[in-house]
Amino acid sequence: MTFHLSSLFSSGGSSNPQACASFSIRPAPWDGTKILVHQTGYPIDSPPMYSITISSSGKSNVVVSRGWGGGPWDVVGDARLPTFSSKIHLTIHGQPTEMRFSEMSGNSSFPTPSMGKLKWKLDSMSTKKMDLLDESGRKLAKVHSGKASGEKILDILIPHDIFFLEVVLLSAWANKAQNKTALEASGEVIGAVLGA
């Protein structure tokens, strides 16, 4: 499996790229453990393209599944978040890779077979925004807040295939989950120091 690169290296870069595809990512109102992925404009009760499950227990902490994610045959990929390490273990369609996470910046980077190293970079002003950059610093995708409560919007800014979308979804939500875990751990340490 390789990434779709046909138009990736075309000339005509823009300082303000427009989305090639936009996805609405919202918590499922009837299931607090699921996050649903739809193309932007679809109602929350329509069948999702993907569902994301985030768990603090178990072997896989972030799981991306096709549709509602009814069984193991629907699983696209999963991420195992570290307890005492900076390496997030990703598996997508059976292919393992490691994503390196920086607690100082909240950024993470991971290798891809055909695009080199990609990096999720948190906005320095808001942890609600993050950009996916390639090695040259070109923005490939971005995640930002949507209009509805709890909604995130994923904009993919380059021509892509389904595999690239799945890599983006898994790596983005693994990074978000690890940032949340690191923030909670920092809060506990500060609380322990102040309480002592």
Language model features with spans:
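Low-complexity or membrane-interfacial segments used for flexible interactions
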Residues: 1-44, 48-49, 107, 114-196
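Acidic, polar low-complexity intrinsically disordered regions
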Residues: 33-127
